[in-house]
Amino acid sequence: MDQSTATPDNAAQSANRGARRTLAATGVNHALHDGYTDLIYVLLPIWQSEFGLGYGMLALMRALYAGAMAGLQIPAGRLAERIDGKVILIFGTVLAALGYGLAGLSGSGAGLCLALVLSGAGSSTQHPLASAAVARAYGASARQPLGIYNFTGDLGKASIPALLSMLLIFMPWRYALMVLAFAGLAVAIYMALSMPPAGKARHAHAGGTRVKAGAYSRGFMLLFAIGVLDTAVRMGLLTFLPFLLQAKGASLPTTGLALSLVFIGGAAGKFTCGWLGERLGVLRTVLLTEGGTAFGILAVLALPLAPAMMVLPLLGVMLNGTSSVLYGTVPELSRKDQSERAFALFYTGTIGSGAVAPILYGILGDGFGPVAATVATAITAIAICPIAFALARHLRQLPVGAELQ
């Protein structure tokens, strides 16, 4: 009798340990890859000086990395239907590390471009497969762990470029990149040793029937639209914020501090809003964050410099908080065995929006001025609210435990 009652408890404890190991491994991996993504901002001025590159070439380098990362996420999700996601994650991490290692050995702009394409291709595996692994490990309780996973990316964005800057004090940039490449290989080894198998994205079903792509339901597409617009608001505002603050009399150091306040608030928002979404629900949380974003943007426009600076951390919380709620909802609107495809499409859309939105808002700014363009970002945030109401109807239709089917 004791053994029969202990067995389920032991199985549950083992599953919990496995889920925690999955979250820890994917979190470390997320920090590494997001840090790799932002390393290029530190490196571009160095490469411009050493190789005599023009601004067009520098922009091309950034575009090649971002394009490889965004464009290969959906293929990575499909590959996970045939190969364990853990294996693909490890391979992607090794490839991203080797890309930066190759950059450290490059002697020309063409070599750097090739290295960045390789690194971007490696990083393309991380978002969809790691998110799906966390969602699968935690099942119905995945929303808060996905918020934590989302938060770890901000830790990487803050720490790894800063680490590179410190390394550059003591060694040439080529050696510094080698150090970071070896760090990436160490993360890959850590994942191989500690992360449980993630499983394949698609499992066999009775009669060999393949399941239709439920990830592309109407509810998912509404969630996708919210993600695209939310990213557009964030990237559009960040494009104009330095100029708005300078118009209020902010110096260059003050502008840098202001952006840091937004980013710190954003990291806190990613961490807390996943938890908040579990308690308030998706609709209320999205209405809170998007309404707060619109109010915060208008407050920054209307207030003098000092009060506007005080608003920025809270604006950062609202600006980034929605994303954790959205990522946590992806598994609820897709079949468990198709999470990789759903996350791949979702991340591709948000990354693409982050690339296109500043251009569109920039055209608006050229025509009507930065204030009008910034007001347009607030209007976009408000426009998300009716889409959230439409999404809520689809969430209410989900049966209990639907994400586990």
Identify what each model region corresponds to:
Residues 181-204, 387-392:
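C-terminal membrane-cytosol helix-exit motif in multi-pass small-molecule transporters
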Residues 331-333, 337-370:
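A late C-terminal transmembrane helix in Major Facilitator Superfamily
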Residues 115-153:
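Cytoplasmic helix-loop-helix junction between adjacent transmembrane helices
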Residues 87-101, 284-299:
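Structural signature of the two symmetry-related core transmembrane helices
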Residues 40-41, 218-270:
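Extracytoplasmic gate region of multi-pass secondary transporters
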Residues 38, 66-74, 158, 263-271, ...:
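Residue-level signature of mid-helix packing/kink "hotspots" within the transmembrane helices
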